[in-house]
Amino acid sequence: MAGLVDFQDEEQVKSFLENMEVECHYQCYREKDPEGCYRLVDYLEGIQKNFDEAAKVLKFNCEKYGHGDSCYKLGAYYVTGKGGLTQDLKAASSCFLMACEKPGKKSVESCHNVGLLAHDGQVNEDGQPDLGKARDYYSRACDGGYAASCFNLSAMFLQGAPGFPKDMGLACKYSMKACDLGHVWACANASRMYKLGDGVDKDEAKAEVLKNRARQLHKEQQKNVQPLTFG
């Protein structure tokens, strides 16, 4: 049948991939299609393993078109120094911030990453954690259903810090939300709070339910861990 590729035929596969690269280049640079640029990145990463070129396309697509998922991936490149880029956490934070403000598959995770970097403090002018900014971006990601952000919020309210008082009620609220989203340690923390009546009314039955939920999540995570294979 015309148009179908026989993937057992090396020449057909080679021709197919070459055509794919040309098509993605055309979509990106001639048709000015940000999604075409992102497909070109997928091709460069997945087929050619050319991460230096992929970094250039990501930078172009993020800066020129503000493509959210490209900004997210460019931020990840800056975090590790991938694709020939100099490792730069401030640049990474800027990229994640752009992605956070844009619709996209990685928008919520980008907000979480902005929170993480603000919480860590290395990207801040004084090198100290910016707990207000961290809380704001964790909150956005948590509202978007990102479990790790909800858990981090619960930990912030659980521990407290200068200018950021402890609030066990909020700590429990965010632990419960993270637990509902499948975060095993959040379930364990919430269970303990209900068992002790710490920030909430003591409820041993609810504590037991949450403890069992934590156990079940842990069991599922262990089941999903792939064994190492050699040879």
UniProtKB/Swiss-Prot annotation:
Q: Name one GO molecular function term.
A: protein-disulfide reductase activity
Q: Which UniProt keywords apply?
A: Acetylation, Mitochondrion, Repeat
Question: What residue ranges carry the coiled-coil annotation?
Answer: none
Q: Which GO terms describe its cellular component?
A: mitochondrial intermembrane space; nucleoplasm
GO biological process assignments:
respiratory chain complex IV assembly
Can you say where the Sel1-like repeats lie in this chain?
34-66, 68-104, 108-146, 147-183, 184-219
Decide whether keyword tRNA processing is in the record: no
Q: Which SUPFAM superfamilies match?
A: HCP-like
Q: Where in the cell is it found?
A: Mitochondrion intermembrane space
Record function comment: Required for assembly of mitochondrial respiratory chain complex I and complex IV.
The cross-references to PANTHER family, in alphabetical order and at most eight, read: CYTOCHROME C OXIDASE ASSEMBLY FACTOR 7
Binding partners and assembly: Interacts with CHCHD4/MIA40 through transient intermolecular disulfide bonds.
Which named protein is this?
Cytochrome c oxidase assembly factor 7
Q: What is the lineage of its organism?
A: Eukaryota, Metazoa, Chordata, Craniata, Vertebrata
Gene (name only): Coa7
